[in-house]
Every structure is written in C-alpha cells, then in structure tokens.
Amino acid sequence: MSRQCVFIALSNQKGGVGKSTMTVLLASYFHYVMGKRVAVVDCDYPQFSIQSLRTRDMQNVEKSEYLQRMLYEQHERTGQKAYPVLTSGPDKVLETALRLADTCDVVFFDLPGTVNSPGVLETIINMDYLFTPVV
C-alpha cells in the first residue's frame, strides 16, 4: 500500500474516555489550523456520535442565519470547508480508508469501545498511529 496519507485511530476498551471528543479535536486542529486535508471515519457503531453531532450541527446551521454567517466567516478566514465525516463498521473500514487515501493527508478513525467487534484488530494493525485516551 503506497500512500502519503496518514491513518490515525483512537481506541480504548472502555467507553466514555474521550475517543470521539479527541478525534474531533485532532481532526479540527489538523484541518483548520494546519491546513491538512482531513477526513473522519466514525466506526463506533451503533452510536456513531461524531456523525450524529455533524448532522445535528448542520441542521442547526440550516435554521439559523447567525450560524450560517459564522460558518461563512470561518470558511473565508481558513479557506477550508468542513471536513467529511463518514460512517463505517470496523469490518469495512479498511476499504473506506483506502478510498480516502488519495484525497486526504490524514484520516482519523473513531473505533468502538471493544476490540471484540469484527475488524477492529485488523484495523488497528493497519494504522500508522494509535492513540488510547485514558481517564
């Protein structure tokens, strides 16, 4: 697999330790501050909390002229549109990752809170970096 894209996963056997929060913070920093082409793959079935947050944010923006103006100003200031957030089961995440590798500098993966989910161990093995938030 020859690629320049970096794969970074956040994983922990325990729920509620901040995997999703850290994923969003890292992705946002890399994208908006460092100017990297970023994508997030939310593999944390069934909650898909990052995707749910993005959906809720977009619904709120659609209803609020103030938020629309803020989004426009952010785009003007950074030159960056919002990075994509995709969902995938851990068993299909490598296919998703390889599709993104040609268009992204960094892809972040929010993994489920158990390595017992099918595909999680294989996904971890194929990451460039693995962060494990602890409380």
What are these regions (language model features)?
Residues 1-135:
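P-loop NTP-binding core
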